[in-house]
Amino acid sequence: MAVDQQGLLARLVRELVRLPGIGQKTAQRLAFHVLKAEREDALRLAEAIRAVKDGLAFCRQCRNIAEGELCEFCLDPKRDQTRILVVEEPSTTYAIERAGAYRGLYHVLLGALSPLDGVGPSDIRAEELVDRVKLGGIEEVILATSPTIEGEATAIYLTNQLKPLGARVSRIAYGIPVGMDIEYADEVTLLKSIEGRRDL
């Protein structure tokens, strides 16, 4: 059943369609679910969304998700402070953590280079990563960008920026299918990819 393009329900559908991976039909199903749900359940969902927007930010050091100035990984003194694993999105850090394959620091780019879409080095704040390595103490930077054209371009660009600084620059191994986002890979594949990384 099509939702009338006017009114409150249509407004909710239009907002849900803006979410990644949500098409018109899924948005309509979700909107009707919210409508049929108990008022308290719907309000809990709305409050959870508001709390995320009000209570979370990006870590000032690595740009991962944080409830304060620094994320849980940057605050953990037990993590290997000599290695940085570079990912495109915060969700990838949690996928890697579930795999249990890595105990170092992270750097989240919040995207990948895409000149056709107008996304350049300043948009992914590549200079912040370079500055972290320049501060010293970093022995290895592991690039875990997705095996897409944009991810490869980002890895090549970062390698060219980081190699002259003296830290080892490696790339995770390909156990991850080309064209797939890393965050959707299973834990074993991520574990093998990190263990089989190669120098660049």
Regions found by a protein language model. Give the residues of each.
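Extended interfacial segments that mediate partner engagement and assembly in macromolecular machines
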Residues: 27, 75-145
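Long C-terminal interaction/binding lobes of large macromolecular proteins
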Residues: 11, 103, 130-200
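Solvent-exposed alpha-helical segments within well-ordered globular domains of core cellular machineries
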Residues: 10-14, 28-32, 43, 47, ...
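Cys/His-rich Zn2+-binding cysteine-cluster or related metal-binding knuckle/ribbon modules and their
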Residues: 3-9, 18, 26, 31-84, ...
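Catalytic cores of large soluble enzymes that bind and process phosphate-bearing ligands
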Residues: 4, 37, 41, 117-121, ...
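Residue-level signal for pocket-adjacent positions within structured domains
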Residues: 29-30, 57, 69, 91, ...
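Post-transcriptional modification and biogenesis factors for structured RNAs
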Residues: 3, 15, 198
